[in-house]
Amino acid sequence: MLARALLAVEGLLRRKVAPAKVKQLLLLEYILPLGSCVHLTPFFEALKLCRSDVSITVATRGLGLQVLRHSPYIDRLIETPDPLTDLKAAVLFLRGRLRRLKLQPDCVLTGASDQRTRIALLGLLGSSGWRGGYTLRPTLYQRPLDYDRSVSLIANNLRLAGIFRCRPERAEPRVFFSHENAETARALLREANPEGLPLVVMVTQNSGGQATGWHTERFVEVIRHAAEGLGCAVVYVGTSGDAPSIEMIRKAAGRVGTSIAGRTSVTELAAVLAMSDAMVTLDTGTMHVGRAVKTPMVVLGPSWQRPIEWLPLEVSNVRILRGVDRDTVPENYRLDEISVESVIAALDDLLRAYPASVGARADRAEQSLSSIDHLAAGA
């Protein structure tokens, strides 16, 4: 009843702009696992290619800011307090910032990961315009969407473009980085690979909350094969919190490779991955960043999670290894179905199809390089 009353009052007080005539769009992004942030990026590109006249503002925080900082497919970022912990502060801040920027959004959208009542209320109370997208409170939205579990998270996010009668084809995520990020990445890689060998990145740690890890002794065999069998330099990436576990694996592998865990921002990580020849990676946030910069990779996926939702299916430079689908996670599960031999075979096949190449690394880096900085002073 309250929601219907609010919408009725809103209908009398707020101007109504049809989707075809929208010029100012505000998107709210506050559910911030790295993979969720990366999987929203195809929407921005799709809408800009279809409707270049629409100005896109994103209100977000944390990883949302990092992922979109250098994107050419949005027009501005607004950093706000977290509405999930302090809705009032977020509403007041967003109102004030929109007022200072002289922005009156024609609509407010939320992506497939941001289905939270407080985020919907931030759109209602903090901004002008009708609301559309994914929500747990469809009565608060004029154009709600239902999540389609038969398609990927990316495909669900692309359905936002359909509100504006845009029909994007399959799109890949993108993460852009600055020239400064690229220089930082080059310096790290010169330190890790002074001889300029082919470079394989190892992502050995998961996000911490899910059963997506692999056995240390199996990683060790793959690492040694990359170094001794393929003649590659090995670099380990991750967060500062991952560093001790990574060092344990590195020592178990005879101190093969160099760890740069905790030494990169998201965009510096993107540059490092773009400048590498291949990745062997768990299904974790770093994998999604690697996909977004088009790095060839072998992905070790969990059998208990629906592959269509998160994994880069039908991407030519990705080899996915996982067990038969299961509904439950066995105790102490560590991707037990994935053998050392299968990972080594997949890595060998990947590097035959996509040979280590200075030119390929340079092309990948160039495609993700951006001169835009939405967080720079005066931006």
Task: Go through each PLM region and give its residues.
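Catalytic machinery of carbohydrate-active enzymes
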Residues: 1-379
